[in-house]
């Protein structure tokens, strides 16, 4: 049984979502059609935190009861999952590097504001943008992201995400993943393979 563990990006990230639909609700409805075609052969999971995030953007009445049937909400078993010590070491080292990088971004902004006192507001905006990028890009920056990683580890599932931080840490922990930008094509191929398999069985 193939198990996919889904991130919010499929339905919320505009660049990814447009392959499934113009709005989060339309994207979810398209996805659920694929899930229906693959029912019994492929399972789709979401940690509860991720599910709640997605449902902030999706009109529930338009996707019920299918969403309850085809997306399994499951928290990771945080008490029994073992995480290698090297992961903690890498996380600590990554945080240290990011703090140093954030300090350099702040120092640069201070120097610019001293030289150009007339553009302090623009410099602050630039500081916030660069500081956020230095500290958050490519890292697990929320409890929900970590739950996604843990659940995929527990299920030996395949993470589907466009988040660089999630995919980076999936690789570090030996977890299979699919880039969300290619997920629709993956689903289409799975549906086609299932149809061919069923057709061959009928001929026999």
From Swiss-Prot:
Q: Does the keyword tRNA processing apply?
A: yes
Quote the Pfam families the UniProt record gives.
PIN_5 (PF08745)
User: What EC number is given for this enzyme?
Assistant: 3.1.26.5
Q: What class of enzyme is it?
A: hydrolase
Instruction: Give one GO molecular function term.
Output: ribonuclease P activity
Biological processes annotated in GO: tRNA 5'-leader removal
The answer, when asked if Hydrolase is one of the entry's keywords, is: yes
Q: What pairs make up the disulfide bonds?
A: none
Provide this UniProt record's keywords sorted from A to Z: Endonuclease, Hydrolase, Nuclease, tRNA processing
Q: What InterPro entries would the database entry show?
A: PIN-like_dom_sf, RNA_free_RNase_P
- Reactions it catalyzes: Endonucleolytic cleavage of RNA, removing 5'-extranucleotides from tRNA precursor
User: What does this protein's UniProt record list under function?
Assistant: RNA-free RNase P that catalyzes the removal of the 5'-leader sequence from pre-tRNA to produce the mature 5'-terminus.
Q: Which family does it belong to?
A: Belongs to the HARP family.
Mind telling me what this protein is named?
A: RNA-free ribonuclease P
């Amino acid at each position: 049984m193939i198990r996919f563990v889904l991130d919010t990006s499929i339905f919320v990230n505009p660049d990814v979502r447009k392959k499934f639909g113009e709005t989060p609700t339309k994207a979810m409805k398209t996805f659920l059609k694929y899930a229906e075609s693959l029912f019994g052969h492929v399972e789709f999971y979401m940690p509860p935190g991720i599910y709640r995030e997605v449902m902030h953007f999706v009109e529930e009445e338009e996707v019920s009861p299918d969403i309850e049937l085809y997306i399994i909400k499951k928290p990771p078993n945080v008490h029994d999952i073992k995480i290698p010590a090297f992961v903690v070491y890498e996380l600590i080292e990554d945080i240290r590097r990011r703090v140093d990088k954030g300090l350099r971004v702040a120092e640069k902004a201070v120097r610019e504001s001293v030289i150009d006192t007339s553009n302090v507001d623009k410099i602050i905006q630039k500081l916030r943008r660069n500081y956020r990028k230095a500290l958050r890009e490519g890292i697990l920056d929320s409890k929900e992201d970590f739950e996604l990683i843990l659940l995929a580890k527990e299920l030996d599932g395949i993470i589907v995400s466009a988040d660089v931080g999630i995919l980076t840490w999936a690789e570090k922990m030996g977890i299979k993943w699919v880039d969300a930008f290619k997920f629709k094509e993956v689903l289409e191929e799975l549906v086609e393979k299932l149809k061919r398999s069923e057709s061959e069985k009928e001929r026999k």
